[in-house]
Amino acid sequence: SPNSESILQFGDPGTARDFLERESYVISYNRRDRVASWTGEHLTADSLKTGDGVDRDHSKFKEDPDVPSLFRSTLADYSGSGFDRGHMAPAGDAVATQPAMDQTFYLSNMSPQVGIGFNRHYWAYLEGFCRSLTKKFSDVYVFTGPLFLPTKGSDGKYTVTYNVLQGNVAVPTHFYKVILVPQGDNKYAYGAFILPNQAIDTKTPLTNFKVKLTDVEKASGLTFFDKLDVSTLGDLCAATTCAVSSSGGGDA
């Protein structure tokens, strides 16, 4: 409108995000929190076949040159923080080529995660569960991201409290995974999970963290699968066993 043209004649402040396309994933990076709002992947049995010479030991954590320097997360932000640089789109999902794997090590794809008991264990096993779904389903769509959830205090008031590494990188209180699989005849099933960013006993059933899609949407401000009639979506955990295993090929 003419009014908005006048107001924004010197510039539009923007959406505080960068949408970036990689070889094995897409990402919406949140410039304020310096973590991804979401990453999206399409996994298949073929996409998970390891290419010749692909080795995660050849990959190095690095700043994302596609994010303006003012808004980047840096190696210094994470150094000595006590938190792992946790992949949102896992390296273990990007095994087709070395560049694909290298791209998962951009810091834009990292969120600060508790290491022992979470990033290196339960969360890694959940990543393995997502990969294992390709044995049963032709296509597996996975969306992953951080959440900052409120807690209720003794005074009955809700607050959101989280660390910020070096005053730059927000440490999420929780993380979500939303998974979509086909069930034939243009039907689909989904699973949505919200996990706390803390050590989780390996024996804890994955279904303890199962939530409704709208729970993730309300907490994240995102909308998933708006090109589908979500009221018709089946339950992933009815279509297959939703469980994590320490032998499930997890990936930190």
From Swiss-Prot:
Enzyme class name: hydrolase
This protein's UniProt keywords: Endonuclease, Hydrolase, Magnesium, Manganese, Metal-binding, Nuclease, Secreted
Subcellular location as annotated: Secreted
Cofactor needs: Mg(2+); Mn(2+)
Lineage start: Eukaryota, Fungi, Fungi incertae sedis, Mucoromycota, Mucoromycotina
PANTHER family given in the database record: ENDONUCLEASE G, MITOCHONDRIAL (PTHR13966:SF5), ENDONUCLEASE RELATED (PTHR13966)
Annotated family: Belongs to the DNA/RNA non-specific endonuclease family.
Other notes: The active site contains 1 hydrated divalent metal cation that has only 1 direct interaction with the protein; all other interactions are via water molecules.
A GO term for molecular function: RNA endonuclease activity
Active-site residues, record numbering mapped to chain: H87
EC number: 3.1.30.-
Gene Ontology CC annotations of this record: extracellular region; mitochondrial inner membrane; nucleus
Gene name of the record: NUC1CE
PROSITE patterns: NUCLEASE_NON_SPEC
Function: This enzyme has both RNase and DNase activity.
CDD domains per record: NUC
Record organism: Cunninghamella echinulata var. echinulata
Protein name: Nuclease C1
One GO BP: apoptotic DNA fragmentation
Binding residue positions for Mg(2+): N119
